[in-house]
Regions:
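Short helix-adjacent coil turns
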Residues: 74, 158, 171, 191, ...
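The tetratricopeptide repeat
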Residues: 77, 140, 159-162, 179, ...
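A short, hydrophobic/aromatic-rich structural module that often spans a beta strand
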Residues: 79-80, 235-280
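A generic tandem-repeat structural signature
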Residues: 260, 265-317
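Tandem amphipathic alpha-helical repeat scaffolds
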Residues: 127, 165-170, 183-186, 200-212, ...
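Helix-turn-helix repeat elements of alpha-solenoid scaffolds
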Residues: 98, 135-142, 155-160, 194-196, ...
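Flexible helix-coil transition and linker loops at the boundaries of alpha-helical arrays
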Residues: 149-156, 212, 222-240, 270-281, ...
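Short secondary-structure boundary elements
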Residues: 3-214
């Protein structure tokens, strides 16, 4: 309080501020930075959160746009991302961010030399979001999703799940569906081949083991829906179907659901042969080999080992 008011700080004022804000640092800072000597502090304390609302309403459209974009992200946002999404001059943008920081709306930090911004308090973010229209929020989510998609370098579960979140919130059901399948396939690769004991994270899009088959059924239903709508490329859907069947077959073989797993592998072979997808054919024969190992059938192992080597050709020499 002394830092902001400099003078005129007396015990009654301190008690009045504490009673009005409950000692909430956010409300204290917003209240103190909004006082210009002419305002009645009693009126301000009647609805302390209105201070934030009034402060937001006084911002320029450009400054408000920055807050809207940052509100789409879960945490901190780098200055480079803001520059790319808002297509503003870097000097103009840094000036606006500094202005928002002085207003107590944003906080600034540096991570390994990267300048980042986030809301000074979650309550400010909540108020910003509450003032957005559904249309604006969907457009912002789509813009963020499209940007992250173009910048994607590492295929990780976290990167896929971030894309799923933004595409879903933006209303692009097909892109969300696509990354659900790719995320599931990557999870299957880790869990059922490389790290059999790995579990999905708490916030993962991948469901718990006991709900996995239902999840596969939902994705197959979505695939059928997209095919019937004819809005998406059939070639893209064919590729996603192969990835989905491959992930589901690995889950079934790994967990001893052999009848369903083998049926899926047979479907895979048919689809891959029709599309002349040699790389996936080889992977499918490898799944048959894993199946043969699990049930101690050397004839199955030998059969699919030979078929796989034939597809590989000279590469196995």
């Amino acid at each position: 309080i002394e830092c902001y008011l400099k003078e005129g700080v007396y015990p009654e004022l301190v008690e009045q501020l504490y009673q009005g804000t409950g000692g909430n640092p956010l409300l204290l800072v917003q209240l103190l930075t909004s006082l210009d000597g002419s305002q009645d502090i009693t009126k301000l304390l009647q609805d302390p959160y209105s201070i934030i609302t009034r402060r937001l309403s006084s911002l320029s459209p450009e400054a408000r746009q920055i807050l809207d974009v940052i509100s789409i992200f879960a945490g901190k946002v780098s200055f480079d991302i803001l520059t790319s999404l808002l297509t503003k001059d870097a000097l103009e943008l840094i000036y606006l961010c500094e202005h928002l920081k002085q207003y107590g709306l944003l906080s600034e930090s540096s991570d390994s030399g990267t300048l980042e911004y986030s809301f000074a308090h979650d309550q400010i973010k909540s108020i910003v979001i509450s003032q957005q229209t559904e249309a604006r929020r969907r457009i912002l989510h789509l813009r963020v999703a499209q940007y992250l998609e173009t910048q994607q370098q590492d295929t990780t579960l976290q990167s896929y799940e971030t894309l799923i979140y933004h595409f879903s919130a933006g209303g692009n059901r097909f892109k969300a569906f696509k990354y659900r399948i790719l995320s599931l396939n990557l999870y299957a690769e880790l869990c059922y081949e490389l790290l059999p004991t790995l579990e999905a994270g708490v916030d993962s899009e991948v469901p718990a083991e006991d709900n996995m088959l239902n999840f596969f059924d939902e994705l197959e239903h979505d695939l059928t829906t997209f095919r019937s709508s004819a809005f998406e490329s059939s070639q893209d859907l064919d590729k996603l179907e192969i990835v989905l069947l491959y992930a589901e077959s690995r889950y079934c073989i790994h967990n001893g659901i052999y009848e369903k797993g083998c049926a899926l592998l047979d479907r895979l072979l048919q689809r891959e042969n029709a599309l002349h997808d040699t790389a996936m054919l080889i992977k499918t024969h490898l799944q048959y080999i894993y199946y043969g190992v699990q049930i101690y059938r050397t004839d199955i192992i030998e059969q699919h080992l030979q078929l796989g080597m034939t597809l590989l050709g000279d590469d196995v020499c």
